[in-house]
Amino acid sequence: MTIVSRRQFITGVSAMTASISAFDGPALSATAGNQFDLSKPLEGWDTISGQWTVQSVPGASRNGMALVQRATDNEYNVIVAPGGPYRDVRVSVRFRPISGREDASGGLVFRFSEGRYYLIRANALEDNFRLYYFDRGRRMLSTTSIKPPVLGQWHQLQITAQGDRIQGWLDEQVLIDERDARFASGRIGLWTKADSITAFDELTVVPIDN
């Protein structure tokens, strides 16, 4: 097991497959972006809190290896990817909640700057899908009731941030559609809470061409 504070990433061409026609919104055009290889030791990442390791995880897409957050005694665990800042962007990641008694969540951080950021997260122990902003404390912007993600299975999170419009998907279903102009741009990251041990795979960041 390798504890990582750095990581390699691959710059390439990627197209996300989540349907945009499922909601009322502008057509998006985005193809070129960063696809991060979370199966290798990290380079250029900033660990804000937590113990982020690359290890074997069943169902991981690259040689069975994925990025896992293993700390269990922090309020929140955050790691921020290299690249950016991004304003208008689509981000997708696979996550697998492995264990947790207090919390079993996985989240996408976006528009991260100087400790302030937006977060969209799902929790295998709760029947809700939520959008938060963090600015010297957590504040909720939007929530919707869902069937909780299954512990021990892979799920997909996706966000689109375009201007003040923020949309969030869980397993290719759009569940959040909110407007907030608090943070204009920033970096991308991953998040867990409390004693969540969670794996992450296939992180893709695609700037939106307006």
What role is predicted for each listed range?
Residues 1-17:
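N-terminal secretory signal peptides and thylakoid transit peptides that target proteins
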Residues 30-49:
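Extracellular carbohydrate-recognition regions
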Residues 57-77:
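Short carbohydrate-recognition loop motifs
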Residues 71-130:
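Secretory/extracellular carbohydrate-interaction modules
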Residues 93, 153-161, 166-168:
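Short tryptophan-centered beta-strand motifs in secreted/extracellular beta-sheet-rich domains
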Residues 136-156:
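Short, aromatic/His-centered strand-loop micro-motif at the edge of beta-sheets
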Residues 171-189:
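Short, solvent-exposed beta-strand-to-loop segments that form ligand-recognition rims
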Residues 185-210:
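Ligand-recognition surfaces built from glycine- and aromatic
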